[in-house]
Swiss-Prot record:
Cofactor requirements of the protein: Fe cation
Free-text cofactor note: Binds 1 Fe cation per subunit.
Lineage: Eukaryota, Fungi, Dikarya, Ascomycota, Pezizomycotina
Keyword vocabulary terms for this entry: Dioxygenase, Iron, Metal-binding, Oxidoreductase, Phenylalanine catabolism, Repeat, Tyrosine catabolism
EC id: 1.13.11.27
Alphabetized Pfam families for the sequence: Glyoxalase
All residue ranges annotated as the VOC domain in the record: 31-179, 209-369
MF terms (GO), sorted A to Z: 4-hydroxyphenylpyruvate dioxygenase activity; metal ion binding
Family in the record: Belongs to the 4HPPD family.
Record-listed Fe cation binding positions: 212, 295, 380
Name the record gives this protein: 4-hydroxyphenylpyruvate dioxygenase
Length: 412
C-alpha cells in the first residue's frame, strides 16, 4: 500500500490529518471513468452489449492473463466503458489446499453473494479524478466507508494507475481513479482484446460519454444518500423535483440530482413517494433487494442515428402513446422559445423519442426496457441541445409507459 499523499503540515493537534484545511488540495472530478457490473457470465454479457448496443470489447482479464478466480471484459463506445466481471470458481467448493489469497477468497464470496442478492447488477461507478488521495481522504474524514485504501497498480509496459474505493448507497461502490501516468488498454492486469470474429456489419451506434447515473433508494433514504455526496465528495444539489411534479394516477417519486463542483459528474437519487399502487422505484427495490443503480444515461450527438441503429440491432425501448406527440406538436406551435427543432418530429415519433425543453434549448431522450429478467437496470439514451435538465416535462409520460410494463409483469 502506498503512503498517503497528504502532507503532515495539515495534521491537527491529535496528529491526524485535518482534511477540512485542504479543500483546495482536493481534486477535480473529470467525469465517469467506467461502470463495473457483476454478472453471472461476463463473456455473454459483453457479447450482448457489443451486438445490441454497439460496443466493442477493448480489454480482457481472465485465466489467460493469470486471473484464476475472476473473468472481466471491458467494452466501450467512444468515452463510455462498461466492465463485466464474473466469478469463475465456487468459493464454497474450493479445496482446502487451494492457493488462493485471503483477498481473492473474500472477493469471491462477496461476488457470489452479490449475484444471489441482486442478480446481474451494477457494482461500481468509477470517477476519474486528478488527485485520488485528496478525494479519498476528504471523503473518509467526512464519514465514507473505506473499501480500498489508495493503491498504485503498475504495468511495466504501460505505466501506473492510482485507485481507491469507497462505499455509497446499498452495495454500490465508487472507485476513484487517476490515469495520468498510464497508456495501457484499461488497467494493469488487463490485455488488449482480440479482434472480433464477426463477419456481419451491423449499423454503428454513435455515443459520446456517460451523462448521468441514477440510484434508487428505499423509502425515506434519498436525503441521507444525497448527504453522502454533499459531505463526502463536495457535490452540490443541481436539480430536484418532488411527488407533486413526478406523479401519475397510481404512483409518484421524489428525485434530487447531486453534481460535482464542475458539474461533470451528476448522480440523480430517487425514492418512492406515497401513491395508490407500487411505483417503479418500489418495484426496483424489491427485485434488486435494496438500493442500487437504476439506470445509466448515455449521451449521444445524434439520437436519431443512435436509436435507429439500436432498434435495428434489437434493443427494446419503452412504448410512447401517439397522444404524447399530439400534445408536443400543439405545445411547439403555441409556446415561446428561442430555438428550432433540428430533428424531424415525424421521425422522433416513429422512434418513440421523448422531448423536453425550455426557452433556451431542448433534450431528446428514450429509455430501454429492463435489461435483465429482474426489472431493475435499464439504459437511457439522451441528446442535449443547450439544455441541462433531466426531462421533468416527460416524467408523467415516462412513468405511465413504465407502469404499463409493470402491469404486464403483475407488479403495479
Amino acid at each position: 500500500m502506498s503512503p498517503s499523499a497528504i502532507s503532515s503540515e495539515y495534521s491537527n493537534c491529535n496528529g491526524t490529518p485535518d482534511y477540512a484545511l485542504q479543500s483546495s488540495e482536493v481534486s477535480n472530478f473529470n467525469g465517469y471513468d467506467h461502470v463495473t457490473w457483476w454478472v453471472g457470465n461476463a463473456k455473454q454479457a459483453a457479447s450482448y452489449y457489443n451486438t445490441v448496443f454497439g460496443f466493442k470489447t477493448l480489454a480482457y482479464r481472465g485465466l489467460e492473463t493469470g486471473s484464476r478466480y475472476f473473468a472481466s471484459y471491458v467494452v466501450g463506445n467512444a468515452d463510455v466503458r462498461f466492465v463485466f466481471t464474473s466469478p469463475i470458481r465456487s468459493q464454497k467448493c474450493l479445496p482446502e489446499e487451494e492457493p488462493i489469497s485471503d483477498a481473492d477468497r473474500k472477493l469471491l464470496q462477496e461476488c457470489h453473494e452479490h449475484l444471489e442478492k441482486h442478480g446481474d447488477a451494477v457494482k461500481d461507478v468509477a470517477f476519474e479524478v486528478d488527485n485520488v488521495d485528496g478525494v479519498f481522504h476528504k471523503a473518509v474524514a467526512a464519514g465514507a466507508d473505506v473499501v480500498q485504501e489508495p493503491t498504485t497498480l503498475t504495468d511495466k509496459m504501460h505505466g501506473s494507475v492510482r485507485t481507491a474505493v469507497i462505499r455509497t448507497y446499498g452495495d454500490t461502490t465508487h472507485t476513484l481513479i487517476s490515469r495520468a501516468d498510464y497508456n495501457g488498454p484499461f488497467l494493469p492486469g488487463f490485455r488488449t482484446a482480440a479482434p472480433s470474429s464477426a463477419t456481419v456489419q451491423l449499423p454503428s451506434v454513435p455515443l459520446a460519454r456517460i451523462d448521468h447515473c441514477v440510484g434508487n433508494q428505499d423509502w425515506n433514504e434519498m436525503v441521507s444518500a444525497c448527504a453522502f455526496y454533499e459531505q463526502c465528495l463536495s457535490f452540490h444539489r443541481f436539480w430536484s423535483v418532488d411527488d407533486s411534479q413526478i406523479c401519475t394516477e397510481f404512483s409518484a417519486l421524489n428525485s434530487i440530482v447531486m453534481a460535482s463542483e464542475n458539474n461533470l459528474v451528476k448522480m440523480p437519487i430517487n425514492e418512492p413517494a406515497p401513491g395508490k399502487k407500487k411505483s417503479q422505484i418500489e418495484e426496483y427495490v424489491v427485485f434488486n433487494s435494496g438500493a442500487g443503480v437504476q439506470h445509466i444515461a448515455l449521451l449521444t450527438p445524434d439520437i436519431i442515428s443512435t436509436v435507429s441503429a439500436m432498434r435495428a440491432r434489437g434493443v427494446e425501448f419503452i412504448n410512447v402513446p401517439s397522444t404524447y406527440y399530439d400534445t408536443i406538436r400543439q405545445r411547439l406551435k403555441t409556446e415561446k422559445r428561442g430555438w428550432e427543432l433540428k430533428e424531424d418530429l415525424d421521425t422522433i415519433q416513429k422512434l418513440n423519442i421523448l422531448i423536453d425543453y425550455d426557452e433556451g434549448g431542448y433534450l431528446l431522450q428514450l429509455f430501454t426496457k429492463p435489461l435483465m429478467d429482474r426489472p431493475t437496470v435499464f439504459i437511457e439514451i439522451i441528446q442535449r441541445n443547450n439544455f441541462e435538465g433531466f426531462g421533468a416535462g416527460n416524467f408523467k409520460s415516462l412513468f405511465e409507459a413504465i407502469e404499463r410494463e409493470q402491469a404486464e409483469r403483475g407488479n403495479l
